[in-house]
Design a protein with these regions (language model features):
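Glycine/proline-rich active-site loop of Rossmann-fold NAD(P)-dependent oxidoreductases
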Residues: 50, 77-91, 118, 128-141
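Conserved active-site helix of classical SDR/Rossmann-fold NAD(P)-dependent CH-OH oxidoreductases
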Residues: 3, 50-57, 90-91, 95, ...
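A conserved pocket-lining segment of Rossmann-fold NAD(P)-dependent short-chain dehydrogenase/reductase
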Residues: 72-83, 92-116
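Conserved Rossmann-fold NAD(P)-dependent oxidoreductase catalytic core, especially the SDR/UDP-sugar
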Residues: 1-42
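Short-chain dehydrogenase/reductase
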Residues: 31, 37, 42-50, 83-91, ...
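Mid/C-terminal beta-alpha module of Rossmann-like enzyme folds, strongest
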Residues: 97, 124-179
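Active-site Tyr-X1-5-Lys
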Residues: 27-29, 42-68, 73, 98
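Conserved C-terminal active-site "lid" loop/helix of NAD(P)H-dependent oxidoreductases
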Residues: 118, 174-199
Length: 201
């Protein structure tokens, strides 16, 4: 509806920043994933994001809007309360212990993932709002830079920052469903195009 509403306006070609996700990629994929890798979503969420990317590119190509899509890494540490998203433990195992609360870890320590901080996410959007879109080109959906870290590395960083007592608040409760799901997620990216355009994690 939004894109069609924009199309219906005369002499109106706004910049549209679309929040996409690394969930547009599913197994099998190389590690790291290059910018040229095709979308292979394996979830409804990832499929919806991929559809959004295609629509954004098409409406941009037709001159209806000036689009740029940002494939965000998983944002960590997210503020607020834990939620039911399968990825929520990445923030929870840091945020909750730092607040003196117990956190559940449903996966193995060797799970790796692609992260960016809330501050970096804000920077991504500010940069996207002002970047010269001629430099972005026709492929207007970008995989953004981030930090590839394992759960073990997260816990080690927590211990360095807050001590062993804080780490002891992490309760290991293996969940085979979540672990299988998380192992199907991408772990690292080259993100060369976004870096060359000035996006920084």
């Amino acid at each position: 509806y939004l894109l069609e509403a924009i199309r219906a306006q005369k002499d109106y070609c706004p910049r549209v920043i679309f929040t996409s996700s690394i969930a547009v990629f599913g197994v099998p994929f190389p590690d790291p994933i290059p910018d040229t890798h095709h979308r292979t979503p394996l979830s409804s969420y990832g499929t919806q994001k991929a559809i959004g990317e295609l629509l954004l590119a098409d409406y941009s190509r037709r001159g209806i809007l000036q689009g740029i899509g940002l494939r965000l890494p998983t944002i960590c540490i997210r503020p607020g309360l834990p939620n039911k998203a399968a990825s929520s433990f990445f923030s929870g195992i840091l945020r909750e212990p730092l607040n003196g609360k117990e956190a559940v870890l449903p996966v193995s320590d060797d799970v790796r993932h692609w992260h960016a901080s809330p501050r970096a996410a804000v920077g991504f959007f500010l940069h996207a709002a002002t970047i010269d879109l001629e430099l972005v080109g026709r492929n207007c959906n970008l995989t953004l830079p981030g930090l590839c870290a394992s759960v073990k590395e997260q816990i080690e960083a927590l211990e360095r920052a807050a001590g062993k007592d804080t780490v002891s608040l992490i309760r290991r409760e293996p969940d085979p469903f979540i672990e299988k799901l998380v192992y199907s997620w991408p772990q690292s990216f080259e993100a060369e195009k976004a870096r060359s355009l000035g996006f920084k994690a």
